[in-house]
Amino acid sequence: MTLVGNFSPLVLVGDSDRVEAETVGAYLDGWAGHDKVRLATANAIKAILSGAGRLVGSIARGYLPGDPGKLVGVNSDQDQQKSIDVGSHNLFVELLIAAGVASILSEEADLPVAGKADGLVAVAIDPLDGSGNVGLGAPLGTIFSIFPADVEEPFLQPGNRQIAAGYVSYGNSVDLGFSVGEGVIFATLDPVSGQFHITRRNVKLPERTSDLAFNASVQRHLSAGMQAYVNDAFLGKDGPRGRNFNMRWLGAAVGDMHRIMQRGGLFFYVNDSRPGYEKGRLRLVYEANPIAFLAREAGGKATDGSRPILDIVPQTYHERSALVFGVAEELDILGEYFVK
């Protein structure tokens, strides 16, 4: 018996009007005009969205094609690589080379992959963020950063030289958040047309938040100042902060980013006393940088606890960094604790 057929979509009760929104491709074409670097940037983003559309099909099939979480190797930092990690890397590299980018830095490769010799942009990407959630139905994502390729080491530039950045969140819908330096735009993949349609423009973070996203299990390993910040938040309205806080942790930076961009909040994944966590855990070039770019465009902030992420000059391709991002007011408050 066929349980799912080619039926018409569910009609929302009380809100059955279909949104006829501009596609991201059309927006990028208008933004790029005849500018060569902008055209190269637009083509790179389109390639990533094409890859995201293909990747989500594999994610949605779960274990049917095989085990997406099968361990197949390790990356440069000895992090375990799953089958879908490597498959995602191969997919995006193939599409970005075809789009004419100069080089690609991926979490799943030790060194940048060479592309078109005269390419104008370089793309740093985490092909599948949150792969620890593979097979669990929990959030996954793709996150990327686009730099000008006009220097010898495009991936060792500070984040303030980014041309564009974005992420794709694979959840109960496939959502895109991106910016080309003109505000944050949200879009959603229409599975029928295969196109991403813009749903919100000029997205802004709220001025205040009571939502925190962090891994509470590592609290005992945090610095004294950070432990004090967490303890004061846990005390809620009876403590020095004078209000209650909610705690969120999705186990995928893209998932937490997407929630914070919509609802507000503050995320932190900072350095702690555990071996291997002395400088934080997230990668500066293709995780912290694009998040910081988007946070800034949405009126928020992103730091490593003391320095703006976008001002940090990477020393290595896969350099790790502490990361705090979100609502500016709360980040400033955390910063006072961080330096204690």
Swiss-Prot record:
GO CC terms: cytosol
BP-aspect Gene Ontology terms: fructose 1,6-bisphosphate metabolic process; fructose 6-phosphate metabolic process; fructose metabolic process; gluconeogenesis; sucrose biosynthetic process
Residue sites binding substrate per the record: 215
Entry EC no(s): 3.1.3.11
Main localization of the protein described in the UniProt heading: cytoplasm
Classification via CDD domains: FBPase
Residues holding Mg(2+) 1: 107, 126, 128
Keyword Hydrolase: yes
Example GO molecular function: magnesium ion binding
Pathway: Carbohydrate biosynthesis; gluconeogenesis
Compartments, record wording: Cytoplasm
Names of required cofactors: Mg(2+)
Pfam families reported for this sequence: FBPase (PF00316), FBPase_C (PF18913)
Cofactor note: Binds 2 magnesium ions per subunit.
Keywords: Carbohydrate metabolism, Cytoplasm, Hydrolase, Magnesium, Metal-binding
SUPFAM superfamilies the record matches: Carbohydrate phosphatase
Catalysed conversion reaction: beta-D-fructose 1,6-bisphosphate + H2O = beta-D-fructose 6-phosphate + phosphate
Binding site for Mg(2+) 2: 126, 129, 287
Matches recorded under NCBIfam families: PRK09293.1-4
Summary of subunit composition and partner proteins: Homotetramer.
PANTHER family, per database record: FRUCTOSE-1,6-BISPHOSPHATASE-RELATED, SEDOHEPTULOSE-1,7-BISPHOSPHATASE, CHLOROPLASTIC
Entry-linked HAMAP family: FBPase_class1
Family assignment from sequence similarity: Belongs to the FBPase class 1 family.
Protein name, as recorded: Fructose-1,6-bisphosphatase class 1
Native source organism of the sequence: Brucella canis (strain ATCC 23365 / NCTC 10854 / RM-666)
